[in-house]
Amino acid sequence: MPKMKSKSSAAKRFKKTANGFKHRQSFTSHILTKKSTKRKRHLRPKKQVNPSDVPLIKRMLCQ
């Protein structure tokens, strides 16, 4: 049986950590002028994937 291919879009967006998966916060790529400095600062750090979404991410990444 051939090797499973991971979804390349998911591989670019999610990274495996010891506690699960991390991802970049949304709403940070464009139209930043109307967003406050505080809002942009809080959107900056990486976030943990919700535990209910972890099985889907694992399946997309073939883990």
Swiss-Prot record:
Record carries keyword Repeat: no
Biological process according to GO: translation
Keyword Chloroplast: no
GO cellular component, one term: cytosolic large ribosomal subunit
Signal peptide span: none
GO MF, any single term: structural constituent of ribosome
HAMAP family linked: Ribosomal_bL35
SUPFAM superfamilies, A to Z: L35p-like
Region annotation Disordered: where it falls in the sequence: 1-55
UniProt entry keywords in alphabetical sequence: Ribonucleoprotein, Ribosomal protein
Family in the record: Belongs to the bacterial ribosomal protein bL35 family.
UniProt protein name: Large ribosomal subunit protein bL35
Ranges of biased composition (kind: Basic residues): 1-25, 32-47
InterPro entries documented for this protein: Ribosomal_bL35, Ribosomal_bL35-like, Ribosomal_bL35_CS, Ribosomal_bL35_sf
